[in-house]
């Protein structure tokens, strides 16, 4: 079977992980110093961390570095996995508040979730600093934000595609409601919009997960959708697309583009 696999931005995104990590360390240190000035008794820094999911190599790598530094400094790191559930993430934020953490580091399941934002407001009112990582929150002002340029990542995918193919019938794999994922797709769409040779023939919701992308792509294949390119919001969804294409034994070559630099 002719299948062309495109690994987009792997080296770039590995650098991005460390850029986000060291930026985050700097922000936490600044907050720690400020907190120390307010509290004369020296104590352990308590940090609550909740990513949208830990089923993603990007967050696993980022968290491993944060854990390493926290261990070296003797700080307490409370890490929770909401598993893409906004209700669960809201409860985790409330738990961090009850545990009297100094800082909450959050990668929101949904940037505009009323439940998540309400919990963050309660935490902020309790004097807890809020840091958003690799995404943004709507209608809420964080104390610090450490993000990659997700829009530009989408632009780079489009530029790579147009450099390698003169035309394409594109299936998009998305995660709606997550600002970072939406920015990636928007950057891609804005870049190809003036090029009629590149057509969007389908859009599927995958929440960036392999186990959701596989059946979604299998279904569009079985429905007879004709496409020669898959553009996924991340590598987890791209891997699901690859598995679906192999499972359905497509004869024509399919290009697959993903973002994150996952192995």
Please report, for each region that a protein language model flagged, where it lies by residue.
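Extracytoplasmic "Venus flytrap"
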Residues: 48-64, 78-90, 95, 110-111, ...
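An alpha-beta-alpha
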Residues: 66, 156-198, 202-203
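Short beta-strand elements in bilobed, periplasmic/extracellular small-molecule ligand-binding domains
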Residues: 70-82, 86, 169-174, 192-211
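Hydrophobic alpha-helical
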Residues: 109-122, 188, 207-263
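Periplasmic-binding protein-like
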Residues: 48, 101-110, 129-133, 171-172, ...
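Hydrophobic membrane-insertion alpha-helices, especially the h-region
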Residues: 17-33
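N-terminal Lys/Arg-rich, disordered targeting/topogenic segments
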Residues: 1-12
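Flexible loop/hinge segments that line or gate small-molecule binding clefts
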Residues: 113, 117-152, 163, 262-263
């Amino acid at each position: 079977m002719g299948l062309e696999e495109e690994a987009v931005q792997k080296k770039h995104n590995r650098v991005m992980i460390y850029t986000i990590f060291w930026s985050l360390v700097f922000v936490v240190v600044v907050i720690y110093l400020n907190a120390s000035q307010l509290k004369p008794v020296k104590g352990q820094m308590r940090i609550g961390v909740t990513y949208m999911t830990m089923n993603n190599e990007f967050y696993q790598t980022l968290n491993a570095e944060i854990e390493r530094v926290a261990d070296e400094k003797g700080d307490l790191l409370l890490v929770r996995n909401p598993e893409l559930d906004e209700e669960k993430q809201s409860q985790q934020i409330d738990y961090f508040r009850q545990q009297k953490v100094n800082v909450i580091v959050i990668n929101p399941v949904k940037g505009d979730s009323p439940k998540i934002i309400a919990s963050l407001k309660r935490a902020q009112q309790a004097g807890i600093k809020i840091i958003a990582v690799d995404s943004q929150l709507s209608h809420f002002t964080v104390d610090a934000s450490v993000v990659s340029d997700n829009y530009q990542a989408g632009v780079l995918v489009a530029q790579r595609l147009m450099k390698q193919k003169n035309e394409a019938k594109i299936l998009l794999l998305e995660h709606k409601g997550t600002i970072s994922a939406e920015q990636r797709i928007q950057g891609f769409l804005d870049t190809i919009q003036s090029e009629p040779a590149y057509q969007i023939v389908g859009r599927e919701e995958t929440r960036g997960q392999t186990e959701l992308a596989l059946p979604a792509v299998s279904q569009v294949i079985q429905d007879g959708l004709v496409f020669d390119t898959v553009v996924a919001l991340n590598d987890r969804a791209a891997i699901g697309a690859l598995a679906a294409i192999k499972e359905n034994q497509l004869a024509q070559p399919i290009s697959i583009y993903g973002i994150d630099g996952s192995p």
